[in-house]
Amino acid sequence: MNKQSGFTLIELVMVIVIIGILAAMAVPRFYDASNNAELAAQQGTEAAVRSAHAIAIAEFKRLPTVMELATHVTSDGTAATPAASGVQVSINGDTYTVLTFTDGTCSSATTTTTGTTGTVGCVGNITGP
């Protein structure tokens, strides 16, 4: 008697269903991990801006101008560049704009991030105190 060995169609379907269920449970976890990593990178950038503000105050013994702050925020050898609304700084591939206002000094540095673009809110002007 010739007996054929192998898996039945029902066994194969059950394995595929189980793999599908496991994949459906794993995908949201990977998505959350990606979002958490992006959020951590944004928070790191925000901390870098706050640190740069504190360093600039310590260095100049006064509140820094926006350009002075931008100089301290640069990373990876990338210099700040003037923009229509202030100074743009690129950190880890994300572009931040240090906004300029009228009173000449940067009394506080705050950040708002949406996607890969962030805004650093700062009171000050581009050229000097």
Regions found by a protein language model. Name each.
Residues N2-A33:
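N-terminal single-pass transmembrane signal-anchor helix
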Residues N2, N35-N36, N92, N125:
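Detector for Asparagine
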Residues A54-P129:
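Periplasmic/extracellular, small/polar-rich flexible segments of pilin-like filament-forming proteins
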Residues A37-L63:
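Membrane-proximal N-terminal amphipathic helix
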Residues Q4, Q42-Q43, Q88:
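Residue-identity detector for glutamine
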Residues N2, P28, V49, K61-P64, ...:
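Short, intrinsically disordered low-complexity segments
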Residues L12-I18, G44, S85, Y96:
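A residue-level detector for conformationally permissive "hinge/kink" positions
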